[in-house]
Regions:
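PLP-dependent class I/II
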Residues: 1-144
Length: 144
């Protein structure tokens, strides 16, 4: 199977999926296990956003998927990513949800809590909230 290159989807990987996810009850069971892992992480993100960033941005509360979309005030996304990196938190690049990563407002960030362990999500969100707060206050002071 693996010695020939093909154009198109990976047929061997598709076969693995078909054998693993045999029927719809198996798919639903597997997705429920994903929910049990992901739901607390997304709840953590939402809690930090609600408690720390009211009036400083907008965000989605997805019922599926792997990202929370956060819109800071215009002109702050790259600054927030830089500040978080300086504090040791790696965020998805600013504007990643836009074609070629070009967000004309420099406002959008995608938060991706699905991969790290819960404790890291919690710590990273504390840093993220602090960076958004600091960047927002600095911008307001510069514009005053």
């Amino acid at each position: 199977y693996l010695d020939a290159m093909t154009i198109g989807p990976d047929k061997v990987n598709q076969l693995r999926h078909v054998k693993f996810l045999k029927d719809m009850p198996t798919v639903f069971d597997h997705m429920q296990r994903h929910r049990e892992i992901l739901a607390p992480k997304f709840a953590c993100v939402h809690s930090h956003l609600e408690q720390g960033l009211q009036g400083m941005g907008r965000w989605t509360q997805p019922e599926g998927g792997y990202f929370v979309s956060f819109d800071a005030r215009p002109g702050l996304a790259r600054t927030i990513v830089r500040m978080a990196a300086e504090a040791g938190v790696k965020l998805t690049p600013a504007g990643a949800a836009f074609p070629y990563g070009n967000d004309p407002e420099d406002a959008n960030l995608r938060l991706a809590p699905s991969y790290p362990p819960f404790e890291e999500v919690d710590r990273a969100m504390r840093v993220f909230v602090t960076c958004v707060q600091l960047a927002t206050v600095r911008q307001a002071l510069e514009q005053a």
